[in-house]
């Protein structure tokens, strides 16, 4: 969005020829999809030039509801199938536990381009790890970490029950509603969210008896992205630094990629010396290198460290100190996780269907033998 016109009434105009939709009256019930309002967002909201954040697909600006004066967050997306998908998935999830609520959606024109404007509750408490970093001398305990992980898990559980994989669960997408002690932690930014009910074998080019097993269950792969993220966030919560890191200064180095793929991380002292074995075991189950072996969200929520979080020991952790000491490198940590998730999404989206020539399939080998070694079969397709 061009910031210089963000605050001017009329910079966003209604879609020509469209009728105004009735007022939403707050967030839709979970799972309900609504049509965007077609009249100008500036009829209902006073827009500000204050940038609150940058989402995957667009800026997030501060705005105020004209009648109530309520401060909200406005995300502008130029219309595209990807933007529509983001709105659809977020709307479907809105109203779910620990998920940032959508208040309104508009379809307007901006500088001659159709755009979608998502008005959301304003998350004034900032990012999860910033809040821990700002605690100073006040100890952050293992029990608090367990309660935070239970809250994040509750959001993921709701999404997965709606057949949505978020696929971008990372520190900057976990925000508090306010600065108050009783603030609620919520998940936002559905720019990479994906429905998990589609069958990958609707791909026009495949041969069922040699398709790779991961292609038969793609929804497990998309959801396992979220489970891996839970493992990384839990690890950082318990010690203040990430399990995988780049030694080269690159956002994601070949060495870091290799450590992620091989699951090479440790629980070094002194930070991990007093952390419970239950917590370490849960991290191991989330950071499994084979996505199909990672815990499901139901298994995660049923783990004693999560479902009995009030009984987790109140052991003081090194987290706040480490986050404060390493705050100059925190942007690098966030960038590394962003890159790692991007790599993972690409890997899972582009799982190869083996080419017939390279497929070691008993039936095909028998057929080839009959044909005297000549391959008359049509080539398979690589979903690259």
UniProtKB/Swiss-Prot annotation:
A motif (Bipartite nuclear localization signal 2) lies at residues 366-370. Residues 14-31 have a biased composition (Low complexity). The modification Phosphoserine is found at residues 253, 309. Its EC number is 2.7.11.1. One of its GO terms (biological process) is intracellular signal transduction. It catalyses: L-seryl-[protein] + ATP = O-phospho-L-seryl-[protein] + ADP + H(+); L-threonyl-[protein] + ATP = O-phospho-L-threonyl-[protein] + ADP + H(+). This is MAP kinase-activated protein kinase 3. It comes from Rattus norvegicus (Rat). The gene is Mapkapk3.
């Amino acid at each position: 969005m061009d910031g210089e016109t963000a605050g001017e009434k009329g910079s966003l105009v209604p879609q020509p020829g469209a009728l105004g939709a009735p007022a939403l009256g707050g967030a839709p019930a979970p799972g309900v999809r609504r049509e965007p309002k077609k009249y100008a967002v500036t009829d209902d909201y006073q827009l500000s030039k204050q940038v609150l954040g940058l989402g995957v697909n667009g800026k997030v600006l501060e705005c105020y509801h004209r009648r109530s004066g309520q401060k909200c967050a406005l995300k502008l997306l130029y219309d595209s199938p990807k933007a529509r998908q983001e709105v659809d998935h977020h709307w479907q999830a809105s109203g779910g536990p620990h998920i940032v609520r959508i208040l309104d959606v508009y379809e307007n024109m901006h500088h001659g381009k159709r755009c979608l404007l998502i008005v959301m509750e304003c998350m004034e408490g900032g990012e999860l790890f910033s809040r821990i970093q700002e605690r100073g001398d006040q100890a952050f305990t293992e029990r608090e970490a367990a309660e935070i992980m239970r809250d994040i898990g509750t959001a993921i559980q709701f999404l997965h029950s709606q057949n949505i994989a978020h696929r971008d669960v990372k520190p900057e997408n976990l925000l508090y509603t306010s600065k108050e002690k009783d603030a609620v932690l919520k998940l936002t930014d559905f720019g990479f969210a994906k429905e998990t009910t589609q069958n990958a074998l609707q791909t026009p080019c495949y041969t069922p008896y040699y398709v790779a097993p991961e292609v038969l269950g793609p929804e497990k792969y998309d959801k396992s992205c979220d489970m891996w993220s839970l493992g990384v966030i839990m690890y950082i919560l318990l010690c203040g630094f990430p399990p995988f890191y780049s030694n080269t200064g690159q956002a994601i180095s070949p060495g870091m990629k290799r450590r992620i793929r091989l699951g090479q991380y440790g629980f070094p002292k002194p930070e991990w010396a007093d952390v419970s074995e239950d917590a370490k075991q849960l991290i191991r189950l989330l950071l499994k290198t084979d996505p199909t072996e990672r815990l499901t969200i139901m298994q995660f929520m049923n783990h004693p460290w999560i479902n009995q979080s009030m009984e987790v020991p109140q052991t003081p952790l090194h987290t706040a100190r480490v986050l404060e000491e390493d705050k100059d490198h925190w942007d690098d940590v966030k960038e590394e996780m962003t890159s790692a998730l991007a790599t993972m999404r690409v890997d899972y989206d582009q799982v190869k269907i083996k080419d017939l020539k390279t497929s070691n399939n008993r039936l095909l080998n028998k057929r080839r033998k009959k044909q005297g070694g000549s391959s008359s079969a049509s080539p398979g397709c690589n979903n690259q």
